[in-house]
Amino acid sequence: MGDLESQFALPLQSKLAIVTGSSRGIGAGIAWELARRGANVCITYVSDNSKLLVEELMAKISQLPHKPMTWACQADLSTTTGAQEVISQLKAYFGSDDLQIHILVNNAATEMVKNIQSVTLEDYNKVFNLNVRGYMLMMQAVVPYLASKGRIINLSSVGARVGFEGVSLYCASKAAVESFTRSWDSELGGDGTTVNAVAPGPVPSDMLDKIPKEIVDMQKARTPVEHRLGTTEEIASIVGWLAGPDASWVSGQVISASGGWSMY
């Protein structure tokens, strides 16, 4: 009975998870939740300004009674080399022959508020290099080390299926993420690996602060569940479930985490 209770309490025991862009916001919440469920977690970040936040998150995780391990990997995932830099840093910890990754959460992203007349090619590259190419390159870097019955969870957005004024680049990039999710599911499912996406509605974060207030207020007013914003904990719990054994028959799906604002 004790073993069964332990497995239920820590469904991700000894799994290695990578959570990109996890120094703050939803990413940090996901890293914490996966660790709380037993996973060892690699936290990726890009800016030196995020180091203190990463250290605080790692210290918080280290206080969990089951003592999950954490690693911090600094890399710019908008570049063509960033994803491989994350893997190289993990290989330095584990050794090339011993690295086995069980969970990848593609979360790192950026947005830009500009009407189409003002968008430049540089703007396009800034958003798509991280939000789309970055996810693809991270997948390519991880797959050689991905364990059977692996879990890939991509962070999308309700914006992938709704047109919002001034954020066309962000919305289009998230639509691409959803298409990636379905295609990768068809490619990787043979060994029990699942690939899913979570599409949050508005959640308090640095990123949300850049979205026009009228868009956020409209979403709150039209959200059936309590007419409020979501929380990082609510999004992280969905990701935690998708990463675990109970979600083994769910794949190729986009889960709208928006309190009913967007219904798929």
Where are these regions (language model features)?
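Conserved glycine-rich cofactor-binding loop
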Residues: 16, 23-25
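Short C-terminal tail/terminal secondary-structure segment
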Residues: 2-8, 162, 222, 240, ...
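Residue(s) in the substrate-gating loop at a strand-loop-helix junction
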Residues: 157
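Substrate-binding pocket helix/loop in short-chain dehydrogenase/reductase
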Residues: 115-116, 120-126, 208, 219-220
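A conserved structural motif in NAD(P)-dependent oxidoreductases
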Residues: 224-235
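Alpha-helical segment proximal to the catalytic Tyr-Lys
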Residues: 144, 186-190, 248
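Active-site helix of classical SDR
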Residues: 139, 173
